[in-house]
């Protein structure tokens, strides 16, 4: 029997999107993106999926199993509406049904399916479930470099008595160029992010719950949407 794992982290926060969009967009979505795969929305999605699976495997260990990840439509829009200078899709235009079309099996590029596998997509109320097959989990485990920073961060916040000073020192271990700011939104105490690490642009948001510190990480566009 194939095992499954559901992973719904705050990086995939399912908040409300406040923009307006048209349901009448027509055209071949694939024509809107650069011929350079790395500049496409599909490549952005692939990187996000791999990042989250890596984080999950660092937290829970590796198992060759189905993994289900959850994204709000607003996050997926950011991937496909910010995919190069030749992009013709205006911000906020892509509807839930249109996103399902973009992510339909016949539209997925080979570069994506060769790595993460034949993903399956469902959606309800602008919340998308992306099901990664066991082969995708295996690919991430066997063919991508370990994220040593994430592994160390997860181990550190799981340690009794962990402090923000220790967490800040860990960031400095990997880069001298970081930004740390207090947050006063009732949910998080501060964020830390790397300023010149193109492969890690996340906002790492931390909250001290007294007995331990928790974190969630957000893509920059999502962080801006939430208005923290």
Task: Kindly give the residue locations of the regions a language model identified.
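Positively charged, polyanion-binding regions of nucleic-acid-associated proteins
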Residues: 36-69, 79, 152-155
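Amphipathic alpha-helical segments
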Residues: 95-104, 160-176
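Charge-enriched amphipathic alpha-helical scaffolds
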Residues: 67, 77-118, 188-191
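A cross-family detector of function-defining hotspots
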Residues: 163, 169-204
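Long, intrinsically disordered low-complexity tandem-repeat segments
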Residues: 12-34
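N-terminal trafficking/processing presequences and adjacent post-cleavage segments
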Residues: 5-8, 12, 146-162
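Charged low-complexity interaction tracts in eukaryotic proteins
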Residues: 105-143, 186-197, 213-214
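Intrinsically disordered, low-complexity regulatory segments enriched in Ser/Thr/Pro
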Residues: 198-228
């Amino acid at each position: 029997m194939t095992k499954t794992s559901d992973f719904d982290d705050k990086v995939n926060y399912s908040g409300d999107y406040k923009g307006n969009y048209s349901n009448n967009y027509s055209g071949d979505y694939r024509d809107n993106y650069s011929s350079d795969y790395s500049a496409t929305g599909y490549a952005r999605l692939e990187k996000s999926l791999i990042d989250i699976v890596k984080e999950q495997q660092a937290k829970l260990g590796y198992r060759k199993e189905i993994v289900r990840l959850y994204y709000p439509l607003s996050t997926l829009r950011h991937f496909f509406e910010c995919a190069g200078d030749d992009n013709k899709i205006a911000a906020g235009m892509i509807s839930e049904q249109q996103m399902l079309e973009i992510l339909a099996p016949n539209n997925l590029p080979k570069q994506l399916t060769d790595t993460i596998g034949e993903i399956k997509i469902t959606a309800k109320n602008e919340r998308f479930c992306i099901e990664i097959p066991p082969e995708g989990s295996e690919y991430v485990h066997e063919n991508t470099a370990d994220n040593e920073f994430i592994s160390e961060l997860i181990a550190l916040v799981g340690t009794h008595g962990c402090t923000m000073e220790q967490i800040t020192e860990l960031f400095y271990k990997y880069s001298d160029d970081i930004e740390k700011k207090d947050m006063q939104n009732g949910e998080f105490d501060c964020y830390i992010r790397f300023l010149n690490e193109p492969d890690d642009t996340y906002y790492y948001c931390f909250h001290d719950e007294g007995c331990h510190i928790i974190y969630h990480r957000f893509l920059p566009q999502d962080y801006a949407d939430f208005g923290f």
